[in-house]
UniProtKB/Swiss-Prot annotation:
GO CC field: ribonucleoprotein complex; ribosome
Family label: Belongs to the universal ribosomal protein uL5 family.
Coiled coil regions in record: none
Keyword Ribonucleoprotein: yes
GO biological process, one term: translation
HAMAP family: Ribosomal_uL5_B
Highest taxon above the source species: Bacteria
Full protein name: Large ribosomal subunit protein uL5
Keywords: Ribonucleoprotein, Ribosomal protein, RNA-binding, rRNA-binding, tRNA-binding
Function (record text): This is one of the proteins that bind and probably mediate the attachment of the 5S RNA into the large ribosomal subunit, where it forms part of the central protuberance. In the 70S ribosome it contacts protein S13 of the 30S subunit (bridge B1b), connecting the 2 subunits; this bridge is implicated in subunit movement. Contacts the P site tRNA; the 5S rRNA and some of its associated proteins might help stabilize positioning of ribosome-bound tRNAs.
Subunit annotation: Part of the 50S ribosomal subunit; part of the 5S rRNA/L5/L18/L25 subcomplex. Contacts the 5S rRNA and the P site tRNA. Forms a bridge to the 30S subunit in the 70S ribosome.
Organism: Synechococcus sp. (strain JA-2-3B'a(2-13)) (Cyanobacteria bacterium Yellowstone B-Prime)
A GO molecular function held by the record: tRNA binding
Length: 180
């Protein structure tokens, strides 16, 4: 079943951006490709409970089980051996991607303390946007009492936009609250 933002994109955003950016074909209009959520876990190598609680939190937030990322090589100063778990990653596409973006923009970001908007400078030069979140409590799926430690995450929104301006126009049309 199509999500609210997916219907908004197809009915309102595509014609608006097509006119605004001067495209002749609707397939030239930038669209969301995927959303990648990444969490680095430095303490996971010593604490297996931290890894399990992080898996449960990210599964609750995204509705999808994360992949455990492992160390590619040993680093003695960090007490990490090759193959040890060092983080978690989830790639969201299609309906889950639109559902997550909807919750992020309309529910989670407004719950951040002293929130004045996200940085308009966090684009990578190719129209993709990356956002860092310091604590997982901004998501309503996380129960405050079950959190043992505040952990952040990186959210990368990958678009088919060719420039940062196109990517910014797309995310602004979705309702992303950029700081002025």
């Amino acid at each position: 079943m199509p999500q609210r933002l997916q219907i908004l994109y197809n009915t309102v955003i595509v014609p608006k951006l097509q006119k605004e950016l001067g495209y002749t074909n609707i397939h030239q209009v930038p669209r969301l490709e995927k959303i990648v959520i990444n969490r680095g876990l430095g303490e996971a190598s010593q604490n297996a409970k931290a890894l399990e609680s992080s898996i449960a939190e990210i599964s609750a937030i995204t509705g999808q089980r994360p992949v455990i990322t492992r160390a590619k090589k040993a680093i003695a100063s960090f007490k990490i051996r090759k193959g040890m778990p060092v983080g978690l990653m989830v790639t969201l596409r299609r309906e889950r991607m639109y559902a997550f973006l909807d919750r992020l923009i309309n529910v989670a970001l407004p719950r951040i303390r002293d929130f004045r908007g996200v940085s308009p400078k966090a684009f990578d030069g190719r129209g993709n946007y990356t956002l860092g979140i310091r604590e997982q409590l901004i998501f309503p799926e996380i129960n405050y009492d079950s959190v043992d430690q505040l952990r952040g995450m990186d959210i990368s929104i990958v678009t088919t936009a060719k420039t940062d301006e196109e990517g910014r126009a797309l995310l602004k049309a979705f309702g992303m609250p950029f700081a002025s």
